[in-house]
């Protein structure tokens, strides 16, 4: 009986130890407040540099994609966001997620 209790105690102790040492891979949930105005210009520019610069150029001058230097004078923020999300011409859809598309669109809409 004593050996069974010892085995149970060791098993329990190991379980507790493993649980305490386990990694916490839980991802933080992003809370979307629904406000696109909270995005700063630097966030929009940073996302552009990460995802768009290859086709539209460092200074929005256009490379294989069109020039975007005055895109805000041609399209409003919602149209720009729609193009980013759904693609157009040679630009495929889904290059960025919806939240990133909104941030980039807000930033680009100010380019007039």
UniProtKB/Swiss-Prot annotation:
Keyword list, A-Z: Cell membrane, Electron transport, Heme, Iron, Lipoprotein, Membrane, Metal-binding, Palmitate, Signal, Transport
Matching NCBIfam families: cytochro_C551
Posttranslational modification: Binds 1 heme c group covalently per subunit.
GO cellular component entries: plasma membrane
Task of the protein: Electron carrier protein.
An example molecular function term from Gene Ontology annotations: electron transfer activity
Subcellular location: Cell membrane
Binding site for heme c: 52, 55-56, 91
Lineage of origin: Bacteria, Bacillati, Bacillota, Bacilli, Bacillales
Signal peptide limits: 1-20
Residue span of region Disordered: 25-44
Inducers of expression: Induced during exponential growth. Repressed by glucose.
Lipidation (S-diacylglycerol cysteine): 21
Entry protein name: Cytochrome c-551
Location (main, coarse): membrane
Superkingdom of the organism of origin: Bacteria
Gene of this entry: cccB
Additional detail: Present in very low amounts in the cell.
Lipidation residue positions, type N-palmitoyl cysteine: 21
Compositionally biased intervals (Basic and acidic residues): 25-35
Residues of the Cytochrome c domain: 39-112
Organism, scientific name: Bacillus subtilis (strain 168)
Topology of the protein relative to the lipid bilayer: Lipid-anchor
PANTHER family noted in UniProt: CYTOCHROME C-551, CYTOCHROME C-553-LIKE
């Amino acid at each position: 009986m004593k050996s069974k209790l010892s085995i149970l105690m060791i098993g329990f102790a190991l379980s507790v130890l493993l649980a305490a040492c386990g990694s916490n891979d839980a991802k933080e949930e992003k809370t979307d407040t629904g406000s696109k105005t909270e995005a700063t210009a630097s966030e929009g520019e940073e996302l552009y540099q990460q995802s768009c610069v290859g086709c539209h150029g460092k200074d929005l001058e256009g490379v294989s994609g069109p020039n975007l230097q005055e895109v805000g004078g041609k399209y409003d923020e919602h149209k720009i966001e729609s193009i980013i999300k759904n693609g157009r011409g040679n630009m495929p859809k889904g290059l960025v997620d919806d939240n990133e598309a909104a941030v980039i669109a807000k930033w680009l809409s100010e380019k007039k």
